[in-house]
Amino acid sequence: MSIQAEAMALVEAVESDVRGLMDAHLERREHWYAHEIVPWELGRNFRDEPWSPEQATLSPEVRTALVLNLLTEDNLPYYHAQFQVFFGPDSPLSEWSRLWTAEEGQHAIAIRNYLLTSRNCDPDVLEDDRVATVRKGWVGAMDTAIDLFNYTAAQELATRISHRNAGAKADCGVAREVMNRVAADENHHFIFYRGVVTAMLDQSPDLTLESMAKVMGGFEMPGTGIPQFRRRAVEMAKLGVYNVRIHLENVVSPLLRYWKVDSLTGLTSVGAKAQERLMTLQDDLTTQAEKFEARLAGKKVRLA
């Protein structure tokens, strides 16, 4: 049996879990409306009153974090398309992907409307960057459906943390509320994806661990096609919104602990090797974090 066939067989084996996780999500998540949060009363016509930097009320670093997070959300069509690669329209996972896409769609609406009404971004640059980002496209390094769920479990947790931290750095109650709402949604989505991976681990630990080691070992946030991504990501890292240390301590290590990866037994040689790679990954990330922090202390972190 090919790896694709094995992966799809595993997906079919956890379909009942998927249904239960989706029902739990619908019961748990509180629906919200972005238009109730956005400060419309601050809005002014950009044609009559063009934007200028002194109108901004947030620091340049916080504005960078909010804009980068927004542009990452703008790539939603590509994230949705990843599900269509693996699942037919009648699959419960396609049903989930439509629900997830509908909920995710409000995130960009909320962040963009806040930034525009509060004049905390250059509207022309923001729109040009959105167009460039979407035209660039995004294709995740996911060969199988198992890869998809290992990636989304880590990515949704990482995105939750990035949104929450960006809001916490903002000297504005509305910005914090917007980002906290978005982060709460990401947490609900993370719980779903983590649950799918948990079910897969129960059914086939070897296949799931092999995929997990590959995905976590080469993990990238889905925003690398954004204009000036490296410079913006470094600014966010320096601000403490998201960096290697945060990725290690708030994403990788908690997930590996939750899944008890270090204590899984009865593995084949393939699973055992993947298990070893995952445990070693934490040491590798620690080294990367220490190097970044040393460079930051010496002010040698390049922005371009």
Describe the role of every protein-language-model region:
Residues 1-304:
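Non-heme di-metal
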